[in-house]
């Protein structure tokens, strides 16, 4: 999971909404 966040971190660098959307995507996976 840490690796996934490490990749999404730099890509989803933005507002909290973007980070939340990324978290939801991880949950979907």
Curated annotation (Swiss-Prot):
Pathway: Carbohydrate biosynthesis; gluconeogenesis. The keyword 4Fe-4S applies. It comes from the Bacteria. GO terms for biological process: gluconeogenesis. Its cofactor is [4Fe-4S] cluster. It catalyses: L-serine = pyruvate + NH4(+). The keyword Nucleotide-binding does not apply. GO terms for molecular function: 4 iron, 4 sulfur cluster binding; L-serine ammonia-lyase activity; metal ion binding. Binds 1 [4Fe-4S] cluster. Its EC number is 4.3.1.17. Keywords: 4Fe-4S, Gluconeogenesis, Iron, Iron-sulfur, Lyase, Metal-binding. Heterodimer of an alpha chain and a beta chain. Belongs to the iron-sulfur dependent L-serine dehydratase family. This is L-serine dehydratase, beta chain. The lineage of its organism: Bacteria, Bacillati, Bacillota, Clostridia, Lachnospirales.
